[in-house]
A protein has these predicted regions:
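Juxtamembrane intracellular "pre-TM" segments in multi-pass secondary transporters
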Residues: 1, 183-216, 237
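Helix-loop boundary and gating motifs at the non-cytosolic
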Residues: 1-48, 209-250, 317
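Structural signature of the two symmetry-related core transmembrane helices
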Residues: 70-84, 277-292
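Hydrophobic core of transmembrane alpha-helices in multi-pass small-molecule transporters
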Residues: 12, 82-86, 92-112, 116, ...
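Multi-pass alpha-helical transporter architecture, strongest
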Residues: 6, 86-87, 173-184, 374-402
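Helix-to-loop junctions at the C-terminal end of transmembrane segments
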Residues: 53-67, 150-154, 261-274, 360-361
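A membrane-interface helix-boundary motif in multi-pass transporters
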Residues: 148-171, 358-382
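Conserved MFS/SLC helix-loop-helix module at the cytosolic interface between two early adjacent transmembrane helices
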Residues: 53-90
Length: 402
């Protein structure tokens, strides 16, 4: 297989794992296991928390000691076994601690898969979006596979579907671990000035422009959790009224839009308008989506607005990883990717998980959620982020690819 095909399969499996459980875990925990809002918030905060801690270890190892593809293989194989076991767990305490361990295994692979792709692509600005889109396809495939399984097992609806979402994620993870041994050999870079690559990555924040980028990325990432954490309960609420069987498939509308935006629009917009303007457009798509959620009707418009996630995610987060790759010195690119992962999927999502939960509780009276109030909050904050980008962020020239 060609390098691009192998990288595409890598992205497909990487995000099929996450896409199997992330969109619908909240509904499973609340409706079937009886977890309360705080407990669900804690479970959702674990991957961001792990992303604060573990990517720098993974990035350091891949930058200085072991080949990236072998690191990913080991982490995914062990992680898959954990997921299969977690799918059978029903009590909160056991699930929480096992999820802590699993998330510590999965989190480093988010940055490492990006790094492998960037290093093995000749023109990352042009080709990365086409490779990364296979991750979105994997996320969609996982959602439809889960919906298909649940439709075929419709007779079990009364007693719930159990941990099927976590079991499916475990199967994808084991397959990813096996496949990772076939990835392009990506050894550590030789000759780095410092043996501590992650320290050098942190020093990039001495650049005021990069510091602005990191801070705003963090704030935007906090608002991402309003989508990940609250969309499935919102769609299953009386206000929208979708069934648990249909929600996984309906939510893939967002990823279908991602495919179009990532594969077709992102390379064109970067070339024509530059990364800075693409990032601003990405932030501006967020308040539009959230204001539609806040209005909450008609139902078809709320469902259609899921497609805006394609612009929200690709034009900001995917473009952000490309930006970091263009400015990071070659010998610390793994750790630089870990730094943006830390700021967004890590501390940003971690704070966002609790913030979204707190906002939901604030706007809940006698068990009834005021969804309008909930979604106005991220709408306002993302408008502020877009204005800050326009005022304070300037695009820089890239480093030499190597």
């Amino acid at each position: 297989m060609s390098v691009k095909v192998r990288l595409g399969i890598m992205m497909f499996l990487q995000y099929a794992i996450w896409g199997s459980w992330a969109p619908v875990l909240a509904a499973y925990l609340q409706n079937e296991l009886g977890f309360n809002g705080v407990q669900v918030g804690v479970i959702y905060s674990l991957l961001p928390l792990a992303t604060i801690i573990s990517p720098f270890v993974g990035g350091q190892i891949a930058d200085r000691y072991f080949s990236s593809e072998k690191v990913i293989a080991v982490l995914q194989l062990i992680g898959g076994v954990f997921l299969l076991f977690i799918s059978q767990v029903t009590d909160y305490s056991t699930m929480m601690w096992l999820m802590v361990l699993y998330c510590l295994l999965y989190a480093p692979t988010l940055a490492l898969t990006n790094s492998i792709a960037f290093i093995n692509l000749k023109d990352s600005e042009k080709d990365f979006g086409v490779i990364r889109v296979w991750g979105t396809i994997g996320w969609i495939a996982a959602g439809w596979a889960l919906t298909g399984w649940r439709v075929l097992n419709v007779s079990d609806t009364a007693k719930g579907f159990g941990g099927d979402l976590l079991f499916l994620a475990g199967l994808f993870s084991i397959l990813m671990g096996i496949m990772s041994f076939t990835l392009p050999h990506t050894p550590p870079k030789k000759g780095g000035a410092s043996p501590w690559a992650f320290v050098e990555a942190f020093k990039m924040m001495k650049n005021k422009n990069f510091l602005v980028f990191i801070i705003i990325s963090f704030v935007v990432a906090t608002e991402l959790m309003f989508y990940y954490q609250l969309t499935s309960p919102f769609l299953e609420s009386e206000r929208i009224g979708l069934s648990p069987q249909s929600v996984p498939a309906v939510m893939t509308i967002a990823q279908i839009a991602e495919i179009f935006v990532m594969a077709l629009l992102l390379p064109i917009f970067i070339k024509k308008y530059g990364l800075r303007n693409v990032l601003v457009l990405g932030v501006l798509a967020w308040p539009l989506r959230y204001i539609i959620f806040a209005i909450g009707e008609p139902g078809w418009l709320v469902i259609a607005s899921l497609a805006l996630h394609g612009f929200c995610f690709v034009f900001f987060f995917t473009a952000a990883f490309i930006y970091v790759d263009t400015i990071a010195p070659p010998d610390i690119r793994h750790s630089a990717q870990s730094l943006i992962t830390f700021a967004t999927y890590g501390i940003g999502n971690y704070v966002g998980a609790f913030f979204a939960g707190w906002v939901q509780d604030y706007f809940t009276v006698n068990g009834a959620v005021n969804w309008t109030g909930v979604f106005i909050v991220p709408c306002v904050l993302t408008i502020v982020c877009a204005l800050a980008f326009l005022l304070f962020f300037k695009e820089e020239k890239s480093t030499v690819k190597g």
